């Protein structure tokens, strides 16, 4: 049962969370790359997105609303318990948090509103383990 549930979380995290975030921050990631890597990144990511990095960035203020709505299962869970995994964080939390930490490391774009339970959850995980994630280089989002 646990592995099957883990696979579902992986797929949901990859298809909803990660692929929801990526178009909104792709242009910011490009800016962090070495010049020698930027052409390859642009070519392959624009092919994946079906638009230029600039077009993806231009629509992110609208796209973020759809992304936030897609987080409803997380939000509903976090309204009834402190972590996705229950009373304490577990794999479910870490697999989802990884995408938010990656976004924080590469983009100043605000994915979450401060009054969102998902924002509060992310804040707790940023402070977990002595604040290890928060101390890592990143933007204040």
Describe these PLM feature segments:
Residues 7, 58-60, 64, 68, ...:
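Domain-level signature for proteins that mediate thiol-based redox and metal-cofactor handling
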Residues 14, 71-75, 126:
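Structural signal for well-ordered, non-membrane alpha-helices
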């Amino acid at each position: 049962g646990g592995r099957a549930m883990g696979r579902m979380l992986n797929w949901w995290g990859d298809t909803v969370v990660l692929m929801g975030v990526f178009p909104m921050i792709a242009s910011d990631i490009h800016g962090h790359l070495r010049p020698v890597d930027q052409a390859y990144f642009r070519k392959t990511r624009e092919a994946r997105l079906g638009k230029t990095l600039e077009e993806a960035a231009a629509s992110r203020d609208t796209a973020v609303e759809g992304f936030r709505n897609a987080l409803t299962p997380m939000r509903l869970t976090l309204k009834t318990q402190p972590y996705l995994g229950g009373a304490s964080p577990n794999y479910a939390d870490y697999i989802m948090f990884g995408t938010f930490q990656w976004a924080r490391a590469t983009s100043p774009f605000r994915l979450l509103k401060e009054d969102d339970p998902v924002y509060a959850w992310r804040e707790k995980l940023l402070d977990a383990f002595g604040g290890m994630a928060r101390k890592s280089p990143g933007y204040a989002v």
